[in-house]
Design a protein with these regions (language model features):
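Conserved class I S-adenosyl-L-methionine
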Residues: 1-34, 48-52, 167, 173-177
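Class I SAM-dependent methyltransferase SAM/SAH-binding core
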Residues: 40-79
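Conserved Class I S-adenosyl-L-methionine
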Residues: 46-48, 162-218
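A conserved beta-strand element that flanks and buttresses the S-adenosyl-L-methionine
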Residues: 91
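Short catalytic micro-motifs in class I SAM-dependent methyltransferases
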Residues: 94-95
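A short glycine-rich, Lys/Arg-flanked "PGG" loop and its adjoining helix->strand segment in the class I
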Residues: 103-117
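Short, glycine-/aromatic-enriched active-site segment of Class I SAM-dependent methyltransferases
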Residues: 122-140
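Short alpha-helix
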Residues: 142-157
Length: 218
């Protein structure tokens, strides 16, 4: 999927879903950036989190598997090329639903984190929503419920410190165009998302789950 993501890079950098909204502010706040704090931004995509954290003085390394995203380090979340405890904080935003091996990715993020993780991703809502996501973007693996996230993080040796929810509104046409989803697939996606729209399909909503967790010994 690397080449596909590189071709989408400009669209994701400009995407209002990723570039703004209060959930970005909240993720940055939960990372508690300050001068000298080392933070790894995993699956950094368009670089929105990285830029905001650097503006607050943090020393940020961006990591992404797609060359077109222009990250500092080219690598997937499942294979992070840093030593144990290299970063004070590891963050990933609206990306884990793309991770092929979620357990390995969490294990790697925990390994390189000295203290804390901040994770934002789409909350599991229904099988219809999952089908729509996969039709629109075949790189979508799956979304997870809050209980699943809690289980995965606790099993990885973390203590959940904070949990927040954010309801995000998507412009349907822009959302489909970002992945070149057209024709029959687009029509089917619109049908599947109809229960999540309050305006006849012009927009639809999902819920983002934002968690902050800390290593038990930190």
């Amino acid at each position: 999927m690397t080449d596909v993501w590189s071709s989408r890079a400009d669209a994701y950098r400009a995407s209002p879903t990723h570039a703004s909204d209060p959930d970005l502010d909240l993720v940055v706040e939960m990372c508690e950036p300050r001068a000298g704090k080392r933070i790894l931004d995993v699956a950094s995509g368009g670089g929105h989190v990285t830029r905001r954290l650097r503006e607050r003085g943090a020393e940020v390394v961006s990591l992404d598997p797609s060359p077109g995203m222009h990250a500092d380090v080219l690598a997937p979340a499942e294979h992070i090329p840093f030593a144990d405890g290299s970063f004070d904080c590891v963050v990933t935003r609206i990306a884990p639903h793309h991770f092929a091996e979620i357990g390995e990715a969490i294990g790697e993020m925990v390994r390189v984190a000295n203290a804390e993780l901040v994770i934002e991703d789409t909350l599991y809502m229904s099988e219809e929503h999952e089908e729509a996501e996969k039709l629109r973007d075949p790189s979508h693996v799956r979304s997870y419920s809050e209980d699943e996230w809690r289980d995965m993080l606790v099993s990885a040796g973390l203590e959940i410190e904070r949990v927040e929810y954010f309801e995000k509104t998507h412009q349907t046409d822009e959302w489909l165009a970002r992945t070149d989803c057209t024709g029959e697939n687009a029509e089917r996606v619109r049908e599947l998302l109809a229960p999540l729209s309050a305006d006849g399909g012009r927009t639809w909503r999902d819920t983002k789950l934002i968690l902050k967790a800390r290593k038990a010994q930190a």
